Amino acid sequence: MAKFANYLMLFLLVASLVMLEAQSSDTIKAPDWGKRLLMNHDSDLGAIPCGESCVWIPCISTVIGCSCSNKVCYR
């Protein structure tokens, strides 16, 4: 279980760093729809995105209170 928690934390760290790099860099162009969906805190759902999708598998971040809505995990 400890290995799973370590891998989960590593995954969340890498995912957040990739999103920060995509947001700040001019050379990396994230699709507007995906960028708005994952990084917009003023979304129409009124929720904070957890930074993962739930298209094929459920939200891994349900342990911190996230749930799936419109194929993106929100808290």
Swiss-Prot record:
Keywords attached to this entry: Antibiotic, Antimicrobial, Cytolysis, Disulfide bond, Hemolysis, Knottin, Plant defense, Signal
One biological process term in Gene Ontology: defense response to Gram-negative bacterium
InterPro entries, A to Z: Cyclotide, Cyclotide_bracelet_CS, Cyclotide_sf
Domain of life: Eukaryota
SS bond partners: 50-66, 54-68, 59-73
Record's signal peptide: 1-24
Expression sites by tissue: Expressed in fruit, pedicel, root and stem but not in leaf (at protein level).
Protein known as: Chassatide C8
Taxonomic lineage: Eukaryota, Viridiplantae, Streptophyta, Embryophyta, Tracheophyta
